[in-house]
Amino acid sequence: MVKLRLKQYGGKQQATYRIVAIDARSRGXGRAIQEVGSYDPIKDQTQXNMPTIVYFIERGAQPTETVKDILQKAEIFAQLRAKS
């Protein structure tokens, strides 16, 4: 099963995250299938590759709770519903 989850980058007190599609059985710092976006909690900025996120979700990828919240803030799910 593929999951959309956060992968931490940056140093102490300056953490940034990449939203990645990754096999659910691999560890957190494991090799990602593909990077689909990024999230900076300090600046509260989200960047996402919408077509790639939709591609993975349509094929059964499950976002983690945190990623789901981030994508809802970025209104990705609203765009996904409008598409179908």
Curated annotation (Swiss-Prot):
Keywords for the protein's UniProt record, in alphabetical order: Chloroplast, Plastid, Ribonucleoprotein, Ribosomal protein
Pfam families: Ribosomal_S16
SUPFAM superfamilies per record: Ribosomal protein S16 (SSF54565)
Any one GO biological process: mitochondrial translation
Main location: plastid
NCBIfam families registered for this protein in UniProt: S16
Entry protein name: Small ribosomal subunit protein bS16c
Organism encoding this protein: Huperzia lucidula (Shining clubmoss)
Annotated gene: rps16
